[in-house]
């Protein structure tokens, strides 16, 4: 009889044939255990990614789940249903171009030592991570009371207790929100679930900037799926304001032609008609949170926020400030958001 694994690593993917083998080898080196299990959860458009995974030699046992529904969350949830209910779970992005066994090992060790969740905290290029830096970090802090520098990190570890809470929380979600969690909303959802435990959530500070496939081309889908999940906790009527730490940005040159192209893409994404009064950031974000607290569906509030977000990211990309100023600007905006929305429960006297 095959022994139950103490650790399951889940590798969600869609068309990552060029990087899946390196990520698999790095995860296997971190596990270093023939009782561990690596689950490839794949919804690729061709067999190439699964073929590359199966061809990668590992010490750990492997399972390849193919033909899964499209969506990162759907892949992860299906893998958890099959293999991840009673053990520590490692999640690893499969588009990573510089996978490091030490990172995965550090995440696992912290959870094994008693944390409910450990997340990679890597520096980000200043022109990337726009959803994290301008929106997700502040909203996660509001909802959970935890300042998590990279709340949407795809590289993380979760305790067995955290994993056991996932199915019930997922099935309790409204239909539209559940579909968001089946996509890019999964990262925020897992963090929100873990935050309900008493055990700590631990960011693992890393020195190297993460190298991965650019997310900018997928910005509309990522926003539409992640932001409703980030806003949904406002229905509780309670917001918390932990101290927000420094933002770590990595400098790099953004060629003028590329910047021009990105700004044009952002302009093209802006709805012709929208419910938008050009409220300054982060007050537009605060208004979206208040709307959800007042009964507006999180999906609707996210749609209202979209034009303001596009304008804010455009301004950020066009700005010529240095990294130190940019980092201070991000921290000030997140702090202002939290202080603006700090409240007491609705039923308090």
Model-based region annotation:
Residues 15-29:
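Short, well-formed alpha-helical segments that are part of the catalytic scaffolds
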Residues 36, 50-74:
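Conserved donor nucleotide-binding strand/loop of the catalytic core
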Residues 42-51, 96:
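A conserved acidic beta->alpha catalytic loop
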Residues 11, 34-45:
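Short beta-strand/loop segment that forms part of the nucleotide-sugar
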Residues 99-121:
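Conserved donor-nucleotide/metal-binding helix-loop-beta segment in metal-dependent transferases, i.e.
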Residues 86-97:
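Short beta-strand-to-loop acidic/aromatic patch adjacent to the donor-nucleotide binding site
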Residues 74-88:
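Active-site nucleotide-sugar/metal-binding loop of Leloir-type enzymes
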Residues 224-349:
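Terminal low-complexity segments of carbohydrate-biosynthetic enzymes
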């Amino acid at each position: 009889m095959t022994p139950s694994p103490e650790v399951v690593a889940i590798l969600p993917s869609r068309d990552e044939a060029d990087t899946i083998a390196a990520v698999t080898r790095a995860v296997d080196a971190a596990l270093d255990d023939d009782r561990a299990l690596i689950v490839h959860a794949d919804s690729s458009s061709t067999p190439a990614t699964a073929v590359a995974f199966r061809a990668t030699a590992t010490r750990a046992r492997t399972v390849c789940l193919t033909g899964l529904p499209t969506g990162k969350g759907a892949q992860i949830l299906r893998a958890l249903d099959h293999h991840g209910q009673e053990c520590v779970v490692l999640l690893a992005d499969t588009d990573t171009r510089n996978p490091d066994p030490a990172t995965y090992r550090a995440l696992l060790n912290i959870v094994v030592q008693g944390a409910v969740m450990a997340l990679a905290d890597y520096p980000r290029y200043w022109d990337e991570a726009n959803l994290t830096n301008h929106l997700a970090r502040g909203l996660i802090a509001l909802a959970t009371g935890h300042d998590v520098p990279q709340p949407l990190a795809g590289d993380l570890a979760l305790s067995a207790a955290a994993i056991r809470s996932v199915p019930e929380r997922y099935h309790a979600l409204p239909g539209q929100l559940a579909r968001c969690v089946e996509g890019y909303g999964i990262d925020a959802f897992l963090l929100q679930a873990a935050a309900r435990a008493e055990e700590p959530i631990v960011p693992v500070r890393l020195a190297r900037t993460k190298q991965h496939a650019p997310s900018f081309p997928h910005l509309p889908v990522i926003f539409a799926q992640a932001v409703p999940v980030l806003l949904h906790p406002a229905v509780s009527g309670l917001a918390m304001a932990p101290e927000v730490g420094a933002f770590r940005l990595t400098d790099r040159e953004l060629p003028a032609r590329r910047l021009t192209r990105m700004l044009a893409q952002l302009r093209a994404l802006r709805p012709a008609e929208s419910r938008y009064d050009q409220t300054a950031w982060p007050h537009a974000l605060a208004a979206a949170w208040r709307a959800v607290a007042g009964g507006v569906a999180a999906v609707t509030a996210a749609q209202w926020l979209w034009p303001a977000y596009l304008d804010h990211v455009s301004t950020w990309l066009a700005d010529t400030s240095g990294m130190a100023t940019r980092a201070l600007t991000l921290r000030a905006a997140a702090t202002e958001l939290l202080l603006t929305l700090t409240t007491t429960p609705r039923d308090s006297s």
